[in-house]
Amino acid sequence: VPESAEGVFPFKYDESTIGLLHVEDGMITKSQFVYGDYAEIEDHNRRLKDDPMIGAIGELGFGTQVLPFSGRDIQDEKILGTIHVATGRDDHLGGKITPELFKEHKNASHDDVLYAPHKTPEIRLQQARMIRGGQTEILIEHYKPAKYMVDLLEAELAVEV
């Protein structure tokens, strides 16, 4: 569960529409049209303005398991080299984004977005970075774990004898 987030990341709305989501203080503030159906971008921006909590970054996850792709996002988000971002509720993960914070109850959802070569081939993930303790760490490069992530995984898998 992220404490905050800043930056811009691409978002695939459907098979033909891509936008750039702008994030400030852990909230998506707007979507910027890249290509496709401009009406989808406008609709998303209207919904963000009407109920800003739908743009709350509720989860940022990195796959850590060596598994084949299944075609099911809930399983594929766990595959090494993938990234998933979720907006909305995170209380089921121990976070503080609860249904009461949303303007309308119907908006109080948790929506995962998976980034993986087979799922989002038009989005080239150059790097995913994390700032921790004042240090910027590269976690993933081109859908492959970077040294920092590999070191974390190796430490987690180390077996004492």
Can you say where each PLM-predicted feature lies in the sequence?
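Metal/cofactor-centered catalytic core regions of large enzymes
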Residues: V1-V161
